[in-house]
Amino acid sequence: MNNNTTAPTYTLRGLQLIGWRDMQHALDYLFADGHLKQGTLVAINAEKMLTIEDNAEVRELINAAEFKYADGISVVRSVRKKYPQAQVSRVAGADLWEELMARAGKEGTPVFLVGGKPEVLAQTEAKLRNQWNVNIVGSQDGYFKPEQRQALFERIHASGAQIVTVAMGSPKQEIFMRDCRLVHPDALYMGVGGTYDVFTGHVKRAPKIWQTLGLEWLYRLLSQPSRIKRQLRLLRYLRWHYTGNL
């Protein structure tokens, strides 16, 4: 029988990743023995692997995060290629966030939401309360000034939040989480990018079949042809993968 409260780690180009078998494994790992882990969750895909390679500040930020997991199918395939016995699957960050929120609602875990447009954040709060009765102890949209950061950190600390999710895009959200943890270390932090927009229906996600086939990237490209430059950049990652430079 598999022990879902532990997980192996795998290394890709110096980055250590948690190997979750599936979503249930991820949840059981994070809520091991009924105690929510503390630290920072960071989703890793091919684009982020390239950024880590090219940007020393981002590399330092992400290396410091305790829980780095394979969000992109390319990363999962690279892990399986380098470690043929690895039982690792993609855990999409947007799905993990929703499952965390559902679990938090069930257990009464206090949650603080950061980021997004004011109207999107308000809709996210309302939907979380209606759908899972999430105990939201505070929120702040992404439109705050740099001089307001410290006061926000203090608000988060005073709220007693055990989960803090930050939708500011990378690397802004990683910088925010690093700095906030200096004031409020006893929580699980998660960078969620554009998840609030998807959750509230402002941005359409790829249909399940595209996700299952590992073609979510292609769906996004067809929906947003302007992403072509970003996709072409990923050819470098494919070279790493197919030449075994992992």
Curated annotation (Swiss-Prot):
Query: EC number(s) of the enzyme?
Result: 2.4.1.180
Quote the Pfam families the UniProt record gives. Glyco_tran_WecG (PF03808)
Known pathway: Bacterial outer membrane biogenesis; enterobacterial common antigen biosynthesis
Q: Which InterPro entries match?
A: UDP-ManNAcA_Trfase_WecG, WecG_TagA_CpsF
Q: Which reaction does it catalyse?
A: UDP-N-acetyl-alpha-D-mannosaminouronate + N-acetyl-alpha-D-glucosaminyl-di-trans,octa-cis-undecaprenyl diphosphate = beta-D-ManNAcA-(1->4)-alpha-D-GlcNAc-di-trans,octa-cis-undecaprenyl diphosphate + UDP + H(+)
Q: Which PANTHER family match?
A: PTHR34136, UDP-N-ACETYL-D-MANNOSAMINURONIC ACID TRANSFERASE (PTHR34136:SF1)
Name the HAMAP family for this protein: WecG_RffM
Protein family membership: Belongs to the glycosyltransferase 26 family.
Q: What does this protein do?
A: Catalyzes the synthesis of Und-PP-GlcNAc-ManNAcA (Lipid II), the second lipid-linked intermediate involved in enterobacterial common antigen (ECA) synthesis.
Any idea what this protein is called? UDP-N-acetyl-D-mannosaminuronic acid transferase
Name of the encoding gene? wecG
